[in-house]
Amino acid sequence: MRLILLGAPGAGKGTQAGFIKDKYNIPQISTGDMLRAAVKAGTPLGIAAKKIMDEGGLVSDDIIIGLVKDRLKDGDCANGYLFDGFPRTIPQADAMKDAGVAIDYVLEIDVPDEAIVERMSGRRVHPASGRTYHVKFNPPKVAGRDDVTGEELIQRDDDKEETVKKRLSVYHDQTEVLVGYYNKWAESGQPGAPKYRKIAGVGPVDQIRDNAFKALEG
C-alpha cells in the first residue's frame, strides 16, 4: 500500500494516518523527520540541506526528492509507505513522478472550512498535563477550567481562529491544486497512475476510519 493523504490542515489526516499505518504495517514518510535524520547522519544530502538551512534558505525540491528516494530503500517500506504533508506543490508532485516514486492511491479527506475552523478554534488545553477539551464537542465540567485541577485552560496560538483561517488560505492557494492534479492523472489511465479516492472527514472518527479503509480496498 503506497499512498498520499491529501486534505486541509485540521481535516484529521494525522488521526487517519495512524489507523492506516497500523492496518497496512507501513511507515509514515515525514520530510521533516527525513531532513533532521540526514543532517544528523551527515549524509551528502544532509550536509547540502544543512548549509541551505543555516543560511535561512528553503531546501530545494531536488534535495527533498533525493531524501525521499533514499528513505524508500529502507526495509520498513517493503509493504509500502504513506505520505502526509508531501507533496505540497505541483513541482514537488512532478518531481516525485519523474523520480519514479510509485503511488497506488491518493486519498483526499474532505472537510468544509467552517467545520475545520469550529474544530480547531474550539480546542482548549491544560498546559501542565496536556489534557485537551473542546468548548462544543468535549467541554470541561466548568467552562474554561481543567476537570482535575480546576486550573485555567488556554487556547494555543495555532488554534486561534485567525491563524486557522490563514493556514486554510495557504492550503487553498498552494496545495489544493494537487486535488485536480492527481484526479486528472488517475483518470488518464496511464501506466502507474494512482487510484483517486475522496472521503468526507466529518462525523465519528471510527466511521471516517472505516470509510478510509473501504476506499483503499476498491
Swiss-Prot record:
Sequence positions that bind ATP: G10, A11, G12, K13, G14, T15, R123, T132, Y133, G203
SUPFAM superfamilies found in the cross-reference section: P-loop containing nucleoside triphosphate hydrolases
Signal peptide span: none
Keywords: ATP-binding, Cytoplasm, Kinase, Nucleotide biosynthesis, Nucleotide-binding, Transferase
Protein name from the UniProt record: Adenylate kinase
Family, similarity comment: Belongs to the adenylate kinase family.
Gene3D superfamilies, A to Z: P-loop containing nucleotide triphosphate hydrolases
GO biological process: AMP salvage
Top EC group: transferase
CDD domains, alphabetized: ADK (cd01428)
Spans through the membrane: none
Pathway the protein contributes to: Purine metabolism; AMP biosynthesis via salvage pathway; AMP from ADP: step 1/1
Presence of keyword Cell cycle: no
Cellular localisation: Cytoplasm
Binding site for AMP: T31, R36, G57, L58, V59, G85, F86, P87, R88, Q92, R156, R167
Gene Ontology MF annotations: adenylate kinase activity; ATP binding
Any GO CC annotation of this UniProt entry: cytoplasm
E.C. designation(s): 2.7.4.3
Quaternary assembly: Monomer.
One Pfam family linked to the record: ADK_lid
NMP: annotated segments: 30-59
